[in-house]
Amino acid sequence: MHSCPEVILTLLISGLKSRRERGRMITTILWDVDGTLLDFLAAEKAAIQSLFEEYHLGECTDEKIARYSKINRTYWERLERGELTKPEILVRRFRDFFASEGIDPDLAAEFNEKYQVCLGDTIVYCDDSLNIVKSLQGRVKQYVVSNGTVVAQTKKLRLSGIGELMDGVFLSEDLKAEKPGMEFFTQVFHAIGPVKKEEVLIVGDSLTSDIRGGNHAGIRTCWYHPEGRDDTMIQEAGVQVDEVITDLHEVYRVLEKL
């Protein structure tokens, strides 16, 4: 499948034309960034290890990274539930992490500022995402929808080349609203103009942010989960998933199907 992208794209275009004639097709994709188009864990690890070295905080082992990731994930979930603001979670996650590692928690705010910049230094594509996005240019409208910070995401999108391929970029800090909140998507749809909700597909790795947000917005949802479909996770999140993909190349199949 992956060895003949031109054939796949040709079939996709033919399928899109057929569905356009029948009045049913996906015309717009909303892409998540971290963990979907770009490997966030790789960037996270590189950024933290680099700053540990800069601040002489000792060796930053994989075990430490795992502990931080768990703390970080908990705080982002609280942001999605509206329990905390983004400025609060960005600093408090490092305060908690530093406290657990015997590091001065007062370093958290300064560390986070540098961390946001460093996050954009490491670009690792998920499943050849750059070429996938590029191949869909002119076939569907494509937009970034991300809760990531403006500093980090602007740098990532520029260095990765993904930003220039998009028809628009929507960051929660700019919108002053977070996924999965309806206000986030209301502003997105206001900006992109008239589009039928059934013609819009959101692709993302987070059930609680991307998929729940898609449910709130009344659009099609595609969960990117390399480990495969997990009905227990879906049930626990309480969301409706239209499609599950383990590789971004499967987006072609999804577009042909919907």
What feature does the model see in each segment?
Residues 128-139:
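Catalytic-core regions built around general acid/base machinery
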Residues 99, 138-140, 219:
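Short glycine/proline-enriched coil/turn segments at helix->beta-strand junctions
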Residues 58, 104, 139-140, 195-198:
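Secondary-structure boundary/capping positions in well-ordered alpha/beta enzyme cores
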Residues 85, 123, 144, 201-202:
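Residue-level marker of alpha-helix boundaries and capping positions
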Residues 3, 7-29, 42, 134, ...:
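Asp-based, Mg2+/Mn2+-dependent phosphohydrolase catalytic module
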